[in-house]
């Protein structure tokens, strides 16, 4: 069963999540026992790599204070949200692909995202409109880095029109946007790094990212969510 879970999740589950998934399936076994069996079976989860893309271009517009201050997890949905942009490059294409998501700090769910060959304002605007569909939000924070898109007047106008507070990381402090950094690290280590040459086109890569986000939201369990996926955790918390 351990080997089956490991293969099903493409080598991305280390012993802690395999232990939780076994528990979800009705198996009562100690996590150290799982760790030992994985060593015997030579099952080792993939290591994450660091990402390199940055949209920071200096002081080009309006900034915001860091309202998060390292307290990443919200106590309810849509209380603390996070956004950023990451870049994908493959040998098969001269163009790059850019992913711009919004993550809910309550359960680490990706509530909206946009994929584009250009990290422009239109991409961010489309993502915002997809994520924040209500007329008004009470006590919602959207945290980002100091990328030029997030300093732009149109970004701040949209947030103000919805009652959303803008929050920004300190310059050069990626850990200030830790939840978003963590998601990008998980995403790339589990479906991109080492697979770059397998993608024959940007369309194929785009579909793989769409499929992965669906898997991440609905199926991939997290230790901090008590062995549930983000959607399962939200559903269980609020019925």
Regions found by a protein language model. Give the residues of each.
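RNase H-like two-metal-ion nuclease catalytic core shared by retroviral integrases
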Residues: 54-58, 144-146, 152-153, 166-188, ...
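Mobile genetic element proteins and their domesticated derivatives, centered on retroelements
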Residues: 2, 18, 34, 38, ...
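Active-site beta-loop-alpha junctions of metal-dependent nucleic acid enzymes
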Residues: 95, 113-135
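Short small-residue beta-strand/loop micro-motif enriched in glycine and branched aliphatics
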Residues: 107-113, 167-169, 193-195
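An active-site-proximal beta-strand-loop segment
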Residues: 70-111, 117-119
